């Protein structure tokens, strides 16, 4: 509703109504016609088949906000149960938004902590998923004053819960609020997306090549690449080690791999934000032409870079 009021329609499935049900639209048509029970059975069957194929299932979970529009809009989620306990608010009752989605779940309260833990236990034990990737996880570690705390009770409780002992926990270690970038700050036992690794890999394989073509030399060199490949020890403590870093190059946010090799700048012109949304710092290189092209040498260079 927060997005639809702005005239936007594509929310990527990240405006959660509740924390305990699969999104029915992702199920087969047959399961949808069969109702919620059929959707749930199909999800369980999917997990079972993936396990039989030797694949673990990591569930992307959004506990940092819900689909509530705001105080002036209809009640769609936790506000109808306990608005004060479940949402971060200013003294006058306005929602504190450190997520960019209109509200933030107040994980400083025991009620919100219990709800999230119950949800994790349900997905891990009843539905047998193997791990979780936590969207905007820095929000989950904010205290009553909205400050991030590495030893936040919820972050520790997730690790200490005996029902979640063997479950993988992966943090997207930032949000859009003040002090939101917390890479390397989560407790031992958490893995974190390493955006420094992402950017350095893009530089080495893309922007350095572009700079070398234009200027005859690459600005970054191999030293910082080696540091990232060795585990980003300058970011993650010795106690946590390199396994705390989840290295990646692209994700659902921002440029795809194809975009990285085809655009020097973002062109988000079709979603009503006038190209303001998304970062301008994409560490990309178009290989000589901005956007799609049929030139064979450029197409070949882009494919090689993606590989």
Q: In which residue ranges do the predicted regions lie?
A:
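Substrate-binding/active-site clefts of carbohydrate-active enzymes
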Residues: 2-128, 136-163, 167, 179-180, ...
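Conserved alpha/beta catalytic core and glycan-binding cleft of carbohydrate-active enzymes
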Residues: 128, 144, 149-307
């Amino acid at each position: 509703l927060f997005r639809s009021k702005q005239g936007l329609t594509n929310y990527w499935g990240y405006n959660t109504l509740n924390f305990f049900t699969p999104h029915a639209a992702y199920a087969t048509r047959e399961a949808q016609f069969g109702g919620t029970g059929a959707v749930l059975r199909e999800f369980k069957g999917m997990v079972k088949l993936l396990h039989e194929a030797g694949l673990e299932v990591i569930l992307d979970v959004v506990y940092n906000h819900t689909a509530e529009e705001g105080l002036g809009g209809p009640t769609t989620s936790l506000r109808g149960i306990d608005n004060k306990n479940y949402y971060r608010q200013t003294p006058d009752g306005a929602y504190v938004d450190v997520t960019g989605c209109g509200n933030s779940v107040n994980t400083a309260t025991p009620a919100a902590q219990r709800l999230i833990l119950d949800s994790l236990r349900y997905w891990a034990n009843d539905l047998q998923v193997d791990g979780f990737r936590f969207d905007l996880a820095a929000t989950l570690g904010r205290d009553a004053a909205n400050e991030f705390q590495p030893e936040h009770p919820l972050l520790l409780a997730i690790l200490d819960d005996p029902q979640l002992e063997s479950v993988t926990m992966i943090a997207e270690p930032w949000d859009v609020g003040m002090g939101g970038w917390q890479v390397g700050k989560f407790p031992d036992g958490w893995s974190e997306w390493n955006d420094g690794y992402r950017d350095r890999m893009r530089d080495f394989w893309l922007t350095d090549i572009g700079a070398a073509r234009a200027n005859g030399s690459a600005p970054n060199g191999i030293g910082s690449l080696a540091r990232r490949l060795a585990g980003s020890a300058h970011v993650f403590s010795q106690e946590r080690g390199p396994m705390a870093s989840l290295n990646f190059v692209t994700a659902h946010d921002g440029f795809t791999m194809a975009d990285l090799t085809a655009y020097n700048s973002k062109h988000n012109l079709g979603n009503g934000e006038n190209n303001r949304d998304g970062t301008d710092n994409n560490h990309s290189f178009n290989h000589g032409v901005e956007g799609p092209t049929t030139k064979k040498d450029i197409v070949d260079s882009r494919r090689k870079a993606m590989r």
